[in-house]
């Protein structure tokens, strides 16, 4: 795995406290607010007309939970992220034509949301470990694009 045992400890310890539904919904919502061009992939989700509409949109929250559940699964397979995310990579590349840069943006937003939710418990060491993980996941999701 690309994490040191200490980094893995930081990730595992914090992730055990994460509310996947709440954090996932907030992370995807913030992505859509901060990077509005990403909304084009979610036109079927209904009202995305304002930050409040986006953050309160049940479809955004539900998809955010789905995204973070997949991310959570990836945490159990850090030694094989490309294999773990191969199908999702293909779906997003071939069928949905998502710009792979968006995976990096979502990873960065996730780190911000975790910092927001966990405050002082989200130490610089924990942030560094999570940044490695979200970068690894983004690269795995972008794999089918190459």
Curated annotation (Swiss-Prot):
GO terms for molecular function: haptoglobin binding; heme binding; hemoglobin alpha binding; metal ion binding; organic acid binding; oxygen binding; oxygen carrier activity; peroxidase activity. The modification S-nitrosocysteine is found at residue 93. The modification Phosphoserine is found at residue 44. The modification N6-acetyllysine is found at residues 59, 82, 144. Keywords: Acetylation, Heme, Iron, Metal-binding, Oxygen transport, Phosphoprotein, S-nitrosylation, Transport. Coiled coil: none annotated. Pfam families: Globin (PF00042). GO terms for biological process: hydrogen peroxide catabolic process. It comes from the Eukaryota. Red blood cells. The keyword Phosphoprotein applies. Heterotetramer of two alpha chains and two beta chains. Belongs to the globin family. Involved in oxygen transport from the lung to the various peripheral tissues. This is Hemoglobin subunit beta. It comes from Lemur catta. The gene is HBB.
């Amino acid at each position: 795995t690309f994490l040191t045992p200490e980094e893995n400890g930081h990730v595992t310890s914090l992730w055990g406290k994460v509310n996947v539904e709440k954090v996932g919904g907030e992370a995807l919502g913030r992505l859509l607010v901060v990077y509005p061009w990403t909304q084009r992939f979610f036109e079927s989700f209904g009202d995305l007309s304002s930050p409040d509409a986006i953050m309160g949109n049940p479809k955004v929250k539900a998809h955010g939970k789905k995204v973070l559940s997949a991310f959570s699964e990836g945490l159990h397979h850090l030694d094989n992220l490309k294999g773990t995310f191969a199908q999702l990579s293909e779906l997003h590349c071939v069928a949905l034509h998502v710009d792979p840069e968006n995976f990096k943006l979502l990873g960065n937003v996730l780190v911000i949301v975790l910092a927001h939710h966990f405050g002082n418990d989200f130490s610089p060491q924990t942030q560094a470990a999570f940044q490695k993980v979200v970068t690894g996941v983004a690269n795995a999701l972008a794999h089918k694009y190459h």
